[in-house]
Amino acid sequence: MDNSSDEESEISESEIDVYYEKPYEKLMNGDYKVKVKDTFRCPFCAGKKKQHYKYKELLAHASGVAKGSASRSAKQKANHFALAKYMENELAGDADVPRPQIPSSSTEQSQAVVDDIYVWPWMGIVINPVRRTDNKNVLLDSAYWLKKLARFNPLEVKTLWLDQESVVAVIPQFNSGWSGFKSVTELEKEYEIRGCGRKDWIDKRGDWRSKAYGWCARADDYNSQGSIAEYLSKVGKLRSFSDITKEEIQNKSIVVDDLANKIAMTNEDLNKLQYMNNEKTLSLRRVLIEKDELDRVYKQETKKMQELSREKINRIFREKERLTNELEAKMNNLKIWSKQLDKKQALTELERQKLDEDKKKSDVMNSSLQLASLEQKKTDDRVLRLVDEHKRKKEETLNKILQLEKELDSKQKLQMEIQELKGKLKVMKHEDEDDEGIKKKMKKMKEELEEKCSELQDLEDTNSALMVKERKSNDEIVEARKFLITELRELVSDRNIIRVKRMGELEEKPFMTACRQRCTVEEEAQVQYAMLCSKWQEKVKDSAWQPFKHVGTGDRKKEVVDEEDEEIKKLREEWGEEVKNAVKTALEELNEFNPSGRYSVPELWNSKQGRKATLKEVIDYITQQVKTLKRRRA
């Protein structure tokens, strides 16, 4: 039989109460088969792995889907609602109801027991005649009879004194379930076998005061006269087997409905938690994607600025070489001109005066060119020093913070270009200010200088924006790690691959092993272990104890645990290498993750690789656990 009718369209939540009548009719007509031999099946979930249910299991399944399954459609809810109604109305008699074990040997006796009217909760009656040798106070003690009848497991015992016949009446009360009926039946059977049943008590044959009589309390006892009947009517009531069975069925139906509602509510809560978890996972994934994109853009921008910086430096060196060649050519021309002037002879005073003026002018020009050459040389030296200094700083910063220092490198190169242009402008001020070519060149260099300053400001703005984005991303990652540590602390154990580890706490296993090897008695080993572990945990947290040393040089210099420390050596000699390594590991963790506080801090940990877990590993692990949980629920 198919799970649903193809000819019927989907329905809304508000139509469930109306639509369920159609599948209910088909269930009544036998179109859907529910009961197969001694088991039950869901005709609307034929594709599921489980096909055989008990009555209670199928009723709980149908009620849970009808009332609370968020993953089911309204049509499926209506079908299961009809199935639950059908089972409650038509198949209630097929429910597994426990029947009492009636201790009799024949069918007629069993039917007679079932048809009897009993006092409920189940009670027995024991009559003990008091003889002259008996202690009346002992026989009236309830504790005495609780101990004497302990093999029948009574809940409590009531004793009554029947003055008319001088007997003690004992009324034990039993469990109201079928186990209580079994106990009171065993009591009655035991007394009947000894010939001390209710009939024997009524007949009172022979030496009847020498024996105790017992039987199960029934309607005759309840409706009789006397203190026994008064007590029975006070604490109990008359019930038949059919009444008790019906009440049991009703109670079980109520329990099943309650459990179905709880299952539905639990499923709804689980779906909400799963939705929240998916939201958090997607948020973390978006943060990581944004961070990766920022890193990619940052690297591209850094590479682009480096290429621009190299190109500009090469252009500066080419321009410097060209200016140097021009200066040398002019100096050579001046030398040739000076030699020519020296060779000329002044024919007249006017010519000599003109010649003197030309010489002075030549000397002034030569002096200016020499000063300009010296200034250019100084500027070149400064440029070379700036380049060398920039290279040295670049190598140092790459070992510390590669990405940010690459931006600073570009910024420094641009500043160097600006200084170079300022130097050139300063040199040109010493040249002939009336030269139109020099003026145009100075104007062009000023414009280029302004362009470089604007470009430097743009670089600084870009660098500031990238640094703000990076700080924001880092803050979000830190908050994400804190959130994961808080949420996962109660959800994972030390056996999980991804877990929350308290960095700086001692590993207890080496201490326990060492104490057990030294102490043969387990209790002594436990005490020794607790004292030793507590002592060294406090020692590790003590900031005054600094068992560290520095190894390596320069950038490779780092701080490690000094195994030659007196306390460390003493611990190794007394308790062995494994205990020493446990203390060493705790010190290294504190020195790495909390060097200032010297107290343990929680951290996401990859147990498989023995290192700090990345956010990507934690998210992948959570996703895998959610998928596993879905498969188990399915």
Curated annotation (Swiss-Prot):
For whether the record's keyword set contains Coiled coil, the answer is: yes
Record CDD domains? RRM_like_XS (cd12266)
Show which residues constitute the signal peptide. none
For this protein, the record's InterPro entries field holds: FDM1-5/IDN2 (IPR045177), FDM1-5/IDN2_XH (IPR005379), XS_domain (IPR005380), XS_domain_sf (IPR038588), Znf-XS_domain (IPR005381)
Coiled-coil residue windows = 254-469
Q: Which GO terms describe its biological process?
A: gene silencing by siRNA-directed DNA methylation
In terms of superkingdom, the source organism counts as Eukaryota
Q: Name one Pfam family in it.
A: zf-XS
Q: Could you confirm whether the keyword Glycosyltransferase appears in this record?
A: no
Q: Which UniProt keywords apply?
A: Coiled coil, RNA-mediated gene silencing
Function according to Swiss-Prot or TrEMBL: Acts in association with FDM3 and FDM4 for RNA-directed DNA methylation (RdDM).
Name of the protein: Factor of DNA methylation 5
Organism expressing this protein natively: Arabidopsis thaliana
